């Protein structure tokens, strides 16, 4: 029993370290890709091809001074970025392992973590006691809650298809045909919902530079800003992993799975470099009038398929 617990903790710690390192290289990839989209080089001065750039940025961030907003709620102001990063790392528990001691059979757990992360945005904006931060946090809360509904329905429809909450089953059921082949509209809506869930372009209303300066994290610098930054980018990697697992075969023990994960992460960056920001009413219309009916139709269709299949048997 103690051995199983020790192995679980050790494997989870290794996974978290790998996620944090991959966040550093995702930021480097984003800056390189955006550089080539802007017809420039991107970071290439620090070390070989600019590879140590994210680590030097991290050192620079942590060496900065931490200002304390005079009218802020001190404890909540400092605690919310920590809680945000903790949730975005705990969410990786559902990453499927082939070993028994690390298998986590509850796939809907990630929805609990994403729902709780809404509170961190809200508390961060409110405790900063800044109008810009409060407006950014309110936008983020409305946006995240709206798109979580379609995310939950998409995941539920595919879980009904495989008949289990265990993410391991997605690999077994996609041996001969990927789910993206017969549910391509569902995959597109899942990707769009992931963009909105992680506050990325074209849904970056929580961080609209022209309106809210930096959004809910405007009063944070050094450590607090770094933790929010790490949480956002680890969520991007997690959503890319989930997309690859659910729609692109889910063969997570092979090299191709991580290649597909990197490709989906590249699409996150590519969308940022090419698409303009949506209007806020169009964002809500897209969630409630496009994604929600689509995911509900697929849900009823897959339920009907399951009932018909089991009645034939």
UniProtKB/Swiss-Prot annotation:
Q: Please name the GO terms that the record assigns under molecular function.
A: NADH dehydrogenase (ubiquinone) activity
Location in the cell reads: Mitochondrion inner membrane
Which residues are listed as membrane-spanning? 5-25, 75-95, 104-124, 151-171, 175-195, 227-247, 251-271, 293-313
Top-rank taxon, per record: Eukaryota
Keywords tagged on the record = Electron transport, Membrane, Mitochondrion, Mitochondrion inner membrane, NAD, Respiratory chain, Translocase, Transmembrane, Transmembrane helix, Transport, Ubiquinone
Q: What is the role of the protein in this entry?
A: Core subunit of the mitochondrial membrane respiratory chain NADH dehydrogenase (Complex I) that is believed to belong to the minimal assembly required for catalysis. Complex I functions in the transfer of electrons from NADH to the respiratory chain. The immediate electron acceptor for the enzyme is believed to be ubiquinone.
Grouped into one coarse class, the protein's main location is: mitochondrion
* Catalysed conversion reaction: a ubiquinone + NADH + 5 H(+)(in) = a ubiquinol + NAD(+) + 4 H(+)(out)
Q: How does it sit in the membrane?
A: Multi-pass membrane protein
For this entry, the protein name equals NADH-ubiquinone oxidoreductase chain 1
Q: What class does this enzyme belong to in the EC scheme?
A: translocase
Show the PANTHER family listed in the entry.
Answer: NADH DEHYDROGENASE SUBUNIT 1, NADH-UBIQUINONE OXIDOREDUCTASE CHAIN 1
GO BP of this protein: aerobic respiration
- What's the encoding gene here? ND1
Q: Mind telling me which InterPro entries this protein's record contains?
A: NADH_UbQ_OxRdtase_su1/FPO, NADH_UbQ_OxRdtase_su1_CS
Q: What are the GO cellular component annotations?
A: mitochondrial inner membrane
One Pfam family of this chain: NADHdh
E.C. designation(s): 7.1.1.2
Q: Report the sequence similarity comment from the record.
A: Belongs to the complex I subunit 1 family.
